Amino acid sequence: MNIVIGKIRLQYRIVFLMIIWIAMLVLSLSFLAILQLTFQNDPQGETISSESWAGYIVSRDANAYIQVNAINGSWTVPSVSTTAGDEHSSIWVGVGGQLDDTLIQAGTEQDASGGKEFYYSWYELIPAYAVRVNTIMVSPGDVMVASLRLVDPAVNRWNIQISDSTTGQYFGTTVSYNSTGSSGEWILERPTVSNNISTLADFGNVTFAGCHLSADSKTGPIKAFYFSRIAMTNSVNTQLASVSNIATNGADFTVKYVSTK
């Protein structure tokens, strides 16, 4: 009689342990699935350090490299703090520049020099110098929109548009430029001046909004693609500008000033 009872208890224990093991396996698989889905939908873990850029970049979709053919974004022009020295900040959208030397950009400049502030819009086709847009009078608080679009791939024709939504001023041009289209960026930069990386102007903070791009046959906000955050640091890894997570709409983020140099 005792032997029978012992066998029954042993069987119950085995069944109980199997149930616990199966439950733990299911929970583990569910947790891994959640982690995988979270990374796919919001892969904000990858951060690239740069001495001159702060923002976000898209250079691949899943594990395949992409070819960007259009990009746009908007921002409110920040006011920079006036100093006796020379300090600079550039805000722009661009195509290329991470994986090769081709880079086409459109944006605004916010500089402080000799106790004065300077604001203007521009576009640039690397390696040529930036072209200043004199038909738009930029002021702090103006909402700017910039876009780049490949309109004729056969002859590498790009359309560049910059508009001041606050004043209604607009600039547009079409240029020939051989870009690989290997990446798309939304960047706040301390630009190179006289072959040296400039001192970063105190811009407070700037929010990029409505950041979208088209690559191959896909169009969407930053979060529709695999992306990387770019943190601006100096040569000894001191943070100069911080970059927020991308908003829930997948298209907005904020860059904040931390330190001049």
What residue spans do the PLM features occupy?
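Exposed, interaction-prone regions of secreted/extracellular proteins
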Residues: 34-261
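Secretory targeting signatures
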Residues: 1-38
